[in-house]
Design a protein with these regions (language model features):
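Surface-exposed amphipathic alpha-helical tracts and adjacent flexible/coil segments at the periphery
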Residues: 1-132
Length: 132
């Protein structure tokens, strides 16, 4: 795996690969965590003194970054958590069978794992709005 790392030691995402265990007929994704999302914890994070948020967007489309940053920025500016509709937009923009708060809430376990179903298409209508 080390030989395949990109310049500047960027991640080659082995956690997203399928593995087949000896004796198994089908490969699975035993290392693939759902995306961590603390969108519903913005006010709590602010109270804790968090002054900066990191968005994992290195391998995502620019429209994804636009959708996510708009939702977070609007919610923070208005001093509120994202609405249900905004949370649905976040999930539509990109998620692996939903999001997890597992490490933040110390709820580690199988519910933290998920994959993006094969053939999932990008939400072009949502992304078109981001481009407008």
């Amino acid at each position: 795996m080390r030989d395949k790392l990109l310049p500047r030691q960027l991640c080659a995402q082995p956690c997203r690969l399928a593995f087949r265990w000896p004796g198994d007929k089908k490969a699975s994704h035993p290392l693939s965590l759902k995306d961590l999302s603390l969108a519903g914890q913005l006010e709590r994070l602010k109270e804790m003194g968090v002054a900066c948020l990191k968005l994992e967007g290195r391998m995502k489309r620019p429209e994804y970054v636009a959708v996510v940053t708009k939702i977070y920025a609007t919610a923070l500016k208005e001093g509120r958590e994202p609405t249900g509709d905004e949370l649905a937009q976040l999930e539509a923009a990109f998620s692996r069978q939903g999001f997890t708060q597992g490490y933040y809430r110390d709820q580690k376990g199988p519910a933290m794992f998920g994959t993006r179903p094969e053939g999932t298409k990008d939400p072009e209508e949502l992304f078109a709005q981001a481009r407008a």
